[in-house]
């Protein structure tokens, strides 16, 4: 049997893999998993529009904008990265058949709690654990607690 433990972007990969039906997965652990379409503020849309305008006027200046991950990519990879991180995996999450443990830090800003709740609602055979005093790197911030839940889940 195959068990998968993933975090953040790895959660995207795990959701796609688990929902594909191509590999039989016994148990899946999603920790601060990405993949649910984020709620975007008006300010976010303003920044995207500003970036698109600057990109047309000054591509050099636009290249200095964005997240650190984005800035380090080659021009060819930037569009691929944007497509991947903007793909909503909500429909895929509904197709996951395996037992799934979803762990999120209560203070996660990168993948907020509403995403965890949506995954839990969509994945029929899932359990949701929200850990206090932890953010996106819950597995580092509350290592012993995460280890306990993951161990109990995998050994059950």
Q: Where does each model-flagged region fall?
A:
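Hydrophobic, aromatic-rich cap/lid helix
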Residues: 63-91
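Short beta-strand/loop motif that positions the catalytic acidic residue
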Residues: 95-96, 102-104, 108
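Short alpha-helix in the alpha/beta-hydrolase fold that links the catalytic acid
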Residues: 98, 112-121
């Amino acid at each position: 049997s195959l068990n998968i433990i993933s975090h953040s972007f790895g959660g995207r990969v795990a959701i796609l893999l688990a929902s594909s039906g191509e590999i039989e997965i016994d148990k899946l652990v999603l920790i601060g998993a990405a993949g649910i379409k984020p709620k975007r503020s008006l300010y976010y849309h303003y920044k995207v529009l500003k970036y698109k305008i600057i990109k047309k006027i000054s591509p050099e200046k636009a290249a200095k904008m964005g997240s650190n991950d984005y800035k380090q990519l080659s021009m060819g990879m930037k569009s691929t990265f944007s497509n991947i991180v903007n793909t909503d995996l909500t429909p895929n999450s509904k197709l996951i058949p395996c037992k799934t443990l979803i762990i999120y830090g209560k203070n996660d800003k990168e993948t907020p709690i509403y995403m965890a709740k949506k995954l839990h609602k969509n994945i029929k055979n899932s359990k949701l654990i929200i850990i206090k005093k932890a953010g996106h790197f819950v597995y580092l911030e509350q290592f012993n607690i995460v280890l306990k839940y993951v161990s109990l889940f995998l050994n059950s």
